[in-house]
Amino acid sequence: MANAEYRMLIWGKALLVALFAAALVPGEDKSPSFETQTIRGKVVFLGEVMEQETGIAVVPEARDRVLALQTSRSELIPLIEDVRARAFRRDERLRKMEVELVVRRYANSPAVQIIRVIEVATDGRFEIDYWCDVCSIAMYELKVCECCQGDIALRRTKVPDK
């Protein structure tokens, strides 16, 4: 074997060993850190409430920009607006409900992500979603059915007592 070929073989083996060793070293976990919590209150527009409670002159375009849960202690918890939270923007009936939200609270953020919506009513607790009678599909916001493009209805499913 020629000297150059031997060096290439040695360097190739060294590179393989280095790559294998790097693969074995535990890397930093890139998954976001969050805690699952249950919070209760009414969903409101943050700008409107801040204007009413503090007198801050909120600009008109920001009045209904951010959704928040207002607790019974008047604490305002901003909602990350994904499909679940957008339901509160699209359907004002939801903003009139006392709700219990199962949320993810991410580290280093005051905002939460909604995982589950439960209405707390005088006649019990009800999981809230939308239902298409034609396709038997549940959806999380008011819109046309994703399948048949027909109308969907607000559905309240009784949650068993704990």
Enumerate the predicted regions with their spans.
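Structural detector for short beta-strands of small beta-barrel domains
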Residues: 32-63
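Short, charged beta-turn/beta-strand-edge "cap" motif at the junction between a beta-strand
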Residues: 104-110
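Short nucleic-acid-contacting surface segments enriched for D/E, G, S/T with interspersed K/R
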Residues: 83-100
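Bacterial N-terminal signal peptides
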Residues: 12-23
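Cys/His-clustered metal-coordination modules, chiefly Zn-binding fingers
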Residues: 115-162
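N-terminal secretory signal peptides that target proteins for export/translocation
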Residues: 1-10
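OB-fold (S1/OB) nucleic-acid-binding surfaces
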Residues: 55-79
